[in-house]
Amino acid sequence: MRQRLLPSVTSLLLVALLFPGSSQARHVNHSATEALGELRERAPGQGTNGFQLLRHAVKRDLLPPRTPPYQVHISHREARGPSFRICVDFLGPRWARGCSTGN
């Protein structure tokens, strides 16, 4: 009897581990429904534009603000010396933050 229950219990545990979010499906995300209500009050009859506004409002609530990319100016490149210029030329200005100044 014990050997019959072992495979079924093991498979049940495996399914529970593969789908951990299914137990939390009962909870409703109220921030999305509140954002929808606010958009309907602000701009009625917008059509698909209203949907885009809702998507951006929900996205704004869920994601942290992004920092702007690091900009390397020519004057900074020249002031840091030849090794920095070689590094920037090799990696590109986007990744120049990790280049050594050589000082």
Curated annotation (Swiss-Prot):
Keywords: Antibiotic, Antimicrobial, Defensin, Glycoprotein, Secreted, Signal. Residues 1-25 form the signal peptide. It comes from the Eukaryota. Specifically expressed in caput and proximal corpus of epididymis (at protein level). Present in the epididymal epithelium and on the sperm surface, with a subacrosomal equatorial distribution on the sperm head (at protein level). One of its GO terms (biological process) is antimicrobial humoral immune response mediated by antimicrobial peptide. Transmembrane segments: none annotated. GO terms for cellular component: extracellular region. Glycans are attached at N29. Has antimicrobial activity against E.coli. Plays a role in the defense response in the male reproductive tract, contributing to sperm maturation, storage and protection. This is Sperm-associated antigen 11B. It comes from Homo sapiens.
